[in-house]
Amino acid sequence: MSRPPDSEGEPIEDKSQLIEDLESGCTPRENWRIGTEHEKFPFRLSDHKRLPYEGPDGISEILSRLTRFGWQPVKERDNTIALSLEGCAITLEPGGQFELSGAPLETIHQTCDEVHTHLAQVKEVGEELGIGMLLSLIHI
């Protein structure tokens, strides 16, 4: 929650003052970036059930195997709860889904490459463990 401003400021008396105030908060065009969020729910191909955190085909095993691609584990106590790599993160969401939070990139082509690389990595690990992924959201 943000705190109230220290002062009430001066009343806006002219349209140009409002425009100037709004423009002061704009990011310069050369600093614009695109970020991707991509969620997927892992499930066992054998019985279509959701995965537990622990176990030979659990969420922790998926996260552990993704480290071979350079992802660094983020731990809470002894449990890996996320991975990070070059401005990206793979986080474990409350419903058991994985979310790729992509790096801030300059072009849509870079985000496309990032998502395709991520999906190839997840597919490789999933095939080893007999796990599929149900995609739930892509937001660019």
PLM-predicted stretches and their roles:
Residues S2-P28:
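Short, Gly/Pro- and small/polar-rich lid/capping loops
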Residues E20-T27, S84-L85, H118-A120:
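Short alpha-helical segments and helix-capping/turn motifs at coil-helix boundaries
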Residues R29-W32, T36-F41, L63-H109:
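Polyanion/phosphate-binding surface patch
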Residues D47-E54, I108-C112:
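Short, conserved charged micro-motifs
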Residues G55-I59:
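Short Gly/aromatic-enriched secondary-structure transition segments
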Residues C112-H118:
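"Short basic amphipathic alpha-helical interaction patches in structured regions
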Residues H118-G126, I131-M133:
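Long, contiguous binding/interaction regions
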Residues I138-I140:
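Conserved small/polar residues in nucleotide/adenosyl-binding loops
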